[in-house]
C-alpha cells in the first residue's frame, strides 16, 4: 500500500475540502486520464484496487501513472472505547481529492481500451469521475463540468 516513509506530524486534523483543485488538474504524462468531479478522500487501498483493475484490463500494453499520493493519516479509536482519553492511533492513509484533480493517466493503448480500463477503475473509487483526453484539455483547458 502507498504511504509516506517519514512524516513531520503523526496525527493531523480532518480539515475541510473547499473549492476546486489548483494543482494536478491537467494531463502531464499520458494521453488519457480520469478526473474527479467531486471531492473526497481516496484511501491507499482504493488507489491500489483501481491500479490493479486498470493493469488487468490493459494487460501488458500501455503505461500507467498514479497522480495522487495518500499523505494524510486518518486515526480511529478501538471499538467499544469510552469517549475521551486522547486521539486514536493512525489506522490508514488518504489522499485529499478536490474536483478537477487528475487521478490516473494512461498512454500507449487505443482510446476504447483506455476508456474501458478507466471505467473499471472508477467503480473502485468513492467519488464521481470523468474520462478525459489530452485533446479535451487543449480545447477546454481542463475545466471541470459536473455531470
From Swiss-Prot:
Q: Which pairs of Cys residues are joined through disulfide bonds in the record?
A: none
Official protein name in the record: Large ribosomal subunit protein uL16
What biological process terms from GO does the record include? Answer: translation
**A Pfam family matched in the record:** Ribosomal_L16
Report if keyword Zinc is assigned: no
Note the PANTHER family from the entry. Answer: 50S/60S RIBOSOMAL PROTEIN L16, LARGE RIBOSOMAL SUBUNIT PROTEIN UL16M
Q: Any one cellular component term from GO for this entry?
A: cytosolic large ribosomal subunit
Q: Which family does it belong to?
A: Belongs to the universal ribosomal protein uL16 family.
Coiled-coil intervals: none
Q: Which domain of life is it from?
A: Bacteria
| Record GO terms (molecular function) | rRNA binding; structural constituent of ribosome; tRNA binding
The subunit structure is: Part of the 50S ribosomal subunit.
The entry's keywords: Ribonucleoprotein, Ribosomal protein, RNA-binding, rRNA-binding, tRNA-binding
Q: What does this protein do?
A: Binds 23S rRNA and is also seen to make contacts with the A and possibly P site tRNAs.
